[in-house]
């Protein structure tokens, strides 16, 4: 059992591409686990305000049509920051992709998101020291289930 001293928020993003500096979030999923084991979940489609390339849609299945009426990141930034406040952050490849891209989105809309005092847990770094180095293998190892729909946040 995982012993937490403070909340741990697992983050997964689906995006318009793979460049944290220029691409945008089209879906965010957050699972926040409190030290007492209580969990809260937030999952949102986000209008990136730029076209989603076909190559990105082919990976995660999210289309321009699906996000046309979704809120923009600016519209949900304060809500997301509030959910993540006081939490350490975790994810798969999150230190190299999800967290930098999320930080860029907060900067773009001028919402302060302080990283001081946060621990970052990148499951990919942990898992790469072990067996196969894929999200599906990590999911099978940690959850003992077959991963379906890997590119839905």
PLM regions: where:
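A short, structured active-site edge motif that brings together acidic residues
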Residues: 115-127
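Conserved non-catalytic scaffold segment of RNase H-like nuclease domains
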Residues: 1-117, 132-150
């Amino acid at each position: 059992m995982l012993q937490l001293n403070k909340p741990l928020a697992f983050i997964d993003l689906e995006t318009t591409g793979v460049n944290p500096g220029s691409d945008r979030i089209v879906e965010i999923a957050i699972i926040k686990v409190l030290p007492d084991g209580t969990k809260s979940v937030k999952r949102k489609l986000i209008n990136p305000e730029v076209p989603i390339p076909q190559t990105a849609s082919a990976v995660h299945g999210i289309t321009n049509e699906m996000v046309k009426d979704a809120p923009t990141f600016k519209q949900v930034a304060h809500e997301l920051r509030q959910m993540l406040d006081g939490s350490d952050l975790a994810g798969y490849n999150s230190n190299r992709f999800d967290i930098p891209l999320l930080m860029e989105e907060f900067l773009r809309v001028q919402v302060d998101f302080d990283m001081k005092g946060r621990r970052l847990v990148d499951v990919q770094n942990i898992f790469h020291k072990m067996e196969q180095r894929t999200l599906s293998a990590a999911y099978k190892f940690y959850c003992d289930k077959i991963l379906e729909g890997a590119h839905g946040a």
